[in-house]
């Protein structure tokens, strides 16, 4: 089982972000009491699930957010101790934490996070150019990234991921590759490289809608993506999903669990869980979430995952990965033969350079991954036509 811990707090909201988060910092009233209430409810939620699920091994824990590194290391230590007590942390479990560079500028804090049990850091770098960091509303600068990485390596962190963004307003391929080179000089074990998505209602989207900034043209963004793949590969980082690259042995086990359909338990406001054929999402409202926990009903909005939804999800998530979709799984989930249903469609994708068919697996090429949403939507329409 995987466990995801959603930490809903941020010092401020970045200009591109539409995720659920709550302000936390010196200017926020009652910060300490809000964190204490959140911690108590989260541990209570763990207790409730332990009573329902019984003891089972946990292969991965991911502290996401929000900004988990805003909370003191004793929070992560307490959560991991409770997970191990109730469920059992498997030997060699991957324990990841998202962190902002400015949260890791004190060596003592870095030491404490690793001592608490964190063995993988996913750092929200986004850009190595201070001009773009300011445009994105990020609270750190390039110098903070360098210092944070220095502290992490000195403290013994041997599994470091850097999160980067491409397709930024005013960016071209040369600038993106320069950013990548700068980040790769830090020798990360993992890189996540995401194309910027303008979320409705965010400050960045409003600026774009008002004509105050422009995004790179589609063909320029395609070059950024494909040239980025080549540069990352030249530095020993293999692409294993649309936006994720790693050195051998450093694929994110947590994310691979999501993409391969593993059960996962999400804890905290706005966290989603999928367990034993059911799915639910906790309310994003912290007060309501705490009331749900106090009432002993953390999954009150659970719904069953139908066979069609299960099939769609396995197709969609598998085709995000470079390993692709195993055709035998289609038979298991639908009772039908994939190539009998979709063989001609597959051959068209292969001929267009968008996919490869290797024995019993269908996988998208880098060019196919660029248009994966359209490919998957087309496949879902075919399922409708078949009455599945």
Where are each of the predicted segments found?
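Short, amphipathic alpha-helical interaction segments positioned at domain boundaries
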Residues: 369-388
């Amino acid at each position: 089982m995987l466990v995801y811990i959603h930490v809903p707090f941020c010092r401020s909201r970045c200009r591109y972000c539409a995720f659920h988060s709550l302000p936390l910092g010196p200017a926020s009233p009652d910060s300490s009491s809000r964190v204490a209430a959140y911690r108590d409810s989260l541990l209570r939620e763990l207790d409730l699930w332990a009573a329902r699920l019984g003891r089972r091994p946990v292969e991965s824990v991911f502290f996401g957010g929000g900004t988990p590194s805003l909370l003191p290391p004793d929070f992560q230590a307490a959560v991991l101790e409770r997970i191990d007590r109730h469920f059992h942390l498997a030997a060699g479990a991957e324990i990841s934490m998202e962190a902002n560079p400015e949260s890791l500028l004190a060596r003592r804090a870095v030491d404490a996070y690793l001592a608490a049990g964190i063995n993988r850091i996913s750092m929200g770098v986004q850009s190595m150019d201070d001009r773009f960091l300011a445009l994105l509303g990020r609270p750190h600068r390039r110098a903070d990234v360098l210092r944070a990485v220095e502290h992490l390596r000195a403290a013994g962190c041997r599994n470091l991921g850097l999160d980067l963004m491409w397709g930024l307003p005013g960016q071209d391929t040369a600038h993106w590759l320069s950013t990548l080179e700068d980040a790769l000089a830090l020798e990360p074990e993992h890189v996540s490289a995401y194309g910027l998505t303008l979320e409705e209602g965010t400050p960045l989207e409003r600026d774009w809608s008002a004509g105050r900034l422009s995004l790179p043209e589609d063909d320029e963004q395609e070059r950024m993506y494909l040239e980025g793949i080549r540069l990352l590969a030249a530095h020993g980082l293999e692409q294993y999903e649309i936006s994720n690259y790693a050195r051998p042995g450093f694929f994110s086990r947590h994310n691979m669990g999501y993409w391969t359909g593993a059960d996962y338990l999400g804890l905290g406001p706005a966290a989603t869980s999928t367990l034993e054929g059911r799915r639910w999402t906790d309310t994003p409202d912290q007060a309501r979430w705490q009331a749900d926990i106090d009432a002993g009903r953390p999954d009150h909005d659970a719904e069953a995952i139908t066979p069609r939804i299960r099939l769609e999800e396995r197709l969609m998530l598998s085709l995000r990965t470079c390993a692709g979709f195993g055709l035998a799984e289609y038979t298991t989930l639908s009772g039908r033969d994939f190539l009998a249903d979709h063989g001609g469609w597959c051959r068209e994708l292969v001929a267009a350079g968008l996919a490869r068919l290797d024995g019993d697996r269908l996988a998208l090429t880098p060019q196919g991954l660029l248009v994966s949403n359209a490919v998957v939507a087309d496949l879902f329409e075919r399922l409708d036509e078949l009455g599945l």
